[in-house]
Amino acid sequence: MLVLGLETSCDETGVALYDSERGLLADALFSQIDLHRVFGGVVPELASRDHVKRMLPLIRQVLDEAGCVATEIDAIAYTAGPGLVGALLVGASCAQALAFAWDIPAIGVHHMEGHLLAPMLEENPPEFPFVALLVSGGHTQLVRVDGIGQYELLGESLDDAAGEAFDKTAKLIGLNYPGGPEIARLAEQGVPGRFVFPRPMTDRPGLEFSFSGLKTFALNTWQQCKNAGDDGEQTRCDVSLAFQQAVVETLTIKCKRALKQTGLKRLVIAGGVSANKALRASLEEMLAGMKGNVYYARPQFCTDNGAMIAYAGCQRLLAGQQQDLAISVQARWPMEQLPPL
C-alpha cells in the first residue's frame, strides 16, 4: 500500500510517501521558523496561510523524488489533531479533496501517535510493549504502549510541556525562537555547577510533571544576574546549562520510575525534544544501568514531519480502519481515545 502523508499541525508543512513493502520512499518538509521568528512564536493565521502556499508544491516534490505518479497512490493520511485548528484544516481539506478526486480513502491521524511510531521507521524498531516518553512543545507524557492504539497514560505535565518551557525560558533570557535548540547550543558552553535549578516534582511519588515553576526559577536567576550587571553571554550559557540539566534529570527520573512501575525495559522517546543530545545521553545511561534499551527516531523525524503521519496512517489502513470524506479536526484529542488495532 502506497500512502501519501500530510502534516500541518503547527508551523511545519510535511509531506511523505510511505510504501508498506518498500518503506519510506520520499520525504519533504518546509519549516516556517523564519516566518514566525520575528514574532517570537507561532502566529496561527500566518501558519495556515503558509501551509496553503506550500502543500501542493511539496506533494509534487515527493512524487518526483519517489518516481511515482498520483494514480499509484492508494490512500492519504493527514494529521487531524491535536494542533492549531486552522493549520490542521489546511491538511485535512487538501487530503479529502485529493482523496475524492482520486477515488481513494483518506484517514485522519493523531499527531502524537505519529511521533510515537516514528522510531518504527528506523532499522531496529522497538517491539511492543514499551514505555514511551512523548516530549514536545505541546505535550509531556509517559505512556505504556502495548500495541498501536493500545495506550495507557501513566503521567503527564500539569502545566507547561517541556518543549514549551524550553521556548519560554529562551525568550526570557533573550534568545531567538525556537528556543529549545538555542538553549541546547548555549548549554554546551555553560559552566557546570554555577547555578543549580530544582528538579520539580521528583521529591514525591507519581509520574506527573510540572515545568512552569522551573521557568520562573530561570527568570528570577537571570533577573538577579542582570541587576548585578552580570548578564553577558557566559551567564546566558550557564543559565541555559542549569535549566537543561534540570529538565533532563527530571525527565530521566520519571522515566526510570515508569519503567520500574511497569516492569518494562524498553523506552521510546519521541517528539521534538527527543532530538536533545543531553536528554538522549542521560536516558541511554539510565537504560544501560537497567540493562534495557532506548529507542528514538533520527533527528529529522523527531520534529514534525510527513513520514510519521504516512506510516501511522498506513498501519491503520492496513488493519481495515476506514473514514468518510467529512473534514474533521481536533485541537485537543486524548490519545487514549484512539481505537486499538
From Swiss-Prot:
Taxonomic superkingdom: Bacteria
Co-factor: note: Binds 1 Fe(2+) ion per subunit.
InterPro entries named in the record: ATPase_NBD (IPR043129), Gcp-like_dom (IPR000905), KAE1/TsaD (IPR017861), TsaD (IPR022450)
Source organism of this protein record: Pseudomonas putida (strain GB-1)
Binding site residues for substrate: 134-138, 167, 180, 276
Gene (UniProt): tsaD
SUPFAM superfamilies: Actin-like ATPase domain (SSF53067)
Protein name listed in UniProt: tRNA N6-adenosine threonylcarbamoyltransferase
Enzyme Commission number: 2.3.1.234
A cellular component term, taken from the record's GO annotations: cytoplasm
UniProt-listed GO biological process terms: tRNA threonylcarbamoyladenosine modification
Catalytic activity, as annotated: L-threonylcarbamoyladenylate + adenosine(37) in tRNA = N(6)-L-threonylcarbamoyladenosine(37) in tRNA + AMP + H(+)
Cell compartments where the protein resides: Cytoplasm
MF annotations from Gene Ontology: iron ion binding; N(6)-L-threonylcarbamoyladenine synthase activity
Parts forming coiled coils: none
HAMAP family documented for this protein: TsaD
Keywords for the protein's UniProt record, in alphabetical order: Acyltransferase, Cytoplasm, Iron, Metal-binding, Transferase, tRNA processing
Entry similarity comment: Belongs to the KAE1 / TsaD family.
UniProt function note: Required for the formation of a threonylcarbamoyl group on adenosine at position 37 (t(6)A37) in tRNAs that read codons beginning with adenine. Is involved in the transfer of the threonylcarbamoyl moiety of threonylcarbamoyl-AMP (TC-AMP) to the N6 group of A37, together with TsaE and TsaB. TsaD likely plays a direct catalytic role in this reaction.
